[in-house]
Amino acid sequence: MTAPSQVLKIRRPDDWHLHLRDGDMLKTVMPYTSEIYGRAIVMPNLAPPVTTVEAAVAYRQRILDAVPAGHNFTPLMTCYLTDSLDPNELERGFNEGVFTAAKLYPANATTNSSHGVTSIDAIMPVLERMEKIGMPLLVHGEVTHADIDIFDREAHFIESVMEPLRQRLTALKVVFEHITTKDAADYVRDGNERLAATITPQHLMFNRNHMLVGGVRPHLYCLPILKRNIHQQALRELVASGFNRVFLGTDSAPHARHRKESSCGCAGCFNAPTALGSYATVFEEMNALQHFEAFCSVNGPQFYGLPVNDTFIELVREEQQVAESIALTDDTLVPFLAGETVRWSVKQ
């Protein structure tokens, strides 16, 4: 990586956690990812969810159809785990190169997760098969019991689900997605080479005060929810340390404005247009730009056993204003940091 003060040249990054949606929304958001990233792990929580090889093949084609000419982008598809999923279907998809990984959503933990897993025991045959074939498990790490406070769901998940699971299936590769707490940062750092994590730009840049003090900011509302400053700092320190089992996963999750600015608003930040520059800003603030390229472009492929991208992109350090909104067919989409001035952006 070469890093004169105003330009950062890095190997083309990948996004290891992305929501592209479907239909018109997919067509609108796709270019913001495909112009920057070489690959992305695409979340399967459509309605209905992606639970079969055929559904994944069809969705992959819709994604490719939405990629503009001139963009070189590969979607990496995932299977949505359910209590009734057939392990043979999962293995077939993995062997045919359709499924890169499988996603565990605890039932009702986040958007379109009502079909999710009710207990680890319910899917143990599937998880045992994944361990056997070397297929990574991607985990939304929150418990959903009504008596557990929303700010404590991730820490409880580590203790009650993640650690028992990893003790039981010691060879299973696990990505603890969008970690948000010091508990998770410590857990991943202290884990073995079969455990990795992704972190979003919003959880590195903000804490719950930013979302709640002086008025509710619905466009910072995502799940897992922003936590206390102590947790934000732990995440920043983890990425700044150069730790090699944490990597870029934006969790970019678009919702139309009326679904965010609502009496019961949806969870998710549409950060695809601004994520890479946001990460660069954090690494610069932490005096850790020497680790930026690995976080964006190397650590993820290394964990997944994939080659790194062979093309490069440049970020330029000059102030730019983020658009207030992006047009949809019948509404608008508000990007992460809308209307704000950002320090780093991708050189066009």
UniProtKB/Swiss-Prot annotation:
Pfam families: Amidohydro_1. GO terms for cellular component: cytosol. The modification N6-carboxylysine is found at K103. Pathway: Pyrimidine metabolism; UMP biosynthesis via de novo pathway; (S)-dihydroorotate from bicarbonate: step 3/3. Substrate binds at H19, L20, R21, N45, H140, L223, H255, A267. GO terms for biological process: 'de novo' pyrimidine nucleobase biosynthetic process; 'de novo' UMP biosynthetic process. Its cofactor is Zn(2+). One of its GO terms (molecular function) is dihydroorotase activity. Keywords: Hydrolase, Metal-binding, Pyrimidine biosynthesis, Zinc. It comes from the Bacteria. Binds 2 Zn(2+) ions per subunit. The active site is at D251. Its EC number is 3.5.2.3. It catalyses: (S)-dihydroorotate + H2O = N-carbamoyl-L-aspartate + H(+). Zn(2+) 2 binds at K103, H140, H178. Zn(2+) 1 binds at H17, H19, K103, D251. Homodimer. Belongs to the metallo-dependent hydrolases superfamily. DHOase family. Class II DHOase subfamily. Catalyzes the reversible cyclization of carbamoyl aspartate to dihydroorotate. HAMAP family: PyrC_classII. This is Dihydroorotase.
